[in-house]
Amino acid sequence: LTGDPEVPLGEGSFVDAYDADGAASSLQTKADHFKFRQMAFGEIYGSQGNIGFAPQLNKIDMFIKQVLSGFDSKYLPQKCGMDNENVLAVDLRGNVITCQNVSSKEVSKNGESHLGGTIEHIEAVELKSSTHWSNRPNCSTCPVLQLCKGACMFLDGDLWNVTCENAYSDNVALFALAFERLTGYIPTVIKGEGLPLHRQDIFGTVYTHVEDTNKKVFPIKVVSEKIAKIDDVEVYGQSKVQV
């Protein structure tokens, strides 16, 4: 971005697809995913890690340490850290909510409210708006779990599927970089029962891949609807797509 690898950059990964706008900004085809993985791996490997995205390099180091120490995934926290029983998200009105990225007025993607209660009645607080990675069907056997950490807990349905695909491509490049540092070899295929072929083939160079034919590209307009007004401040809901 700057041409100077000494300039630190705070983020270096995909934003989760929280809404239709995020999904539209995600990788859309298998070819897109393979191209991204090749680029991400190549830029870090080719520069010997001389990039400004320190968080990405730290993830590689962390993964290597976990492999060498035999770290058990049962101790792995969610990416956001909101599964920690000592962490609570509270808005300025004392409402206990899923996390800092949501409003107490919103409904989670699983149909449950993001409002879990109030700090005045802390004993009664109960959040049903999120799903821990250990309760999702494929996370526990995913090769990049230690890097991905389950992505976003409150996503579900199609938005979760898009986010999961993004997170896999984002992290499998780091997985390959860590593997190369550990062994001196660049992996090209990950064999795993139940792992889709486009995930087994890290860079898309080994197998033949057919794109999904049910995907159609439409011109879209992303809009946000005003859902409330609090103390003269307008509150907007999740973005929606108009075709």
Feature names for model-found ranges:
Residues L9, C99, A151:
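Short acidic/histidine-rich active-site segments
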Residues D32-F71, N101-K149:
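C-terminal accessory region of radical SAM enzymes
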Residues L1-D16, A20:
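Radical SAM/AdoMet-radical enzyme domain recognition
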Residues R93, V107, S134-V243:
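Radical SAM enzyme core and accessory elements
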Residues D21-K35:
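Short, surface-exposed amphipathic charged segments that create phosphate/polyanion-binding patches used
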Residues C80-N84:
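Short, small/polar residue-rich loop motifs at catalytic or cofactor-binding pockets
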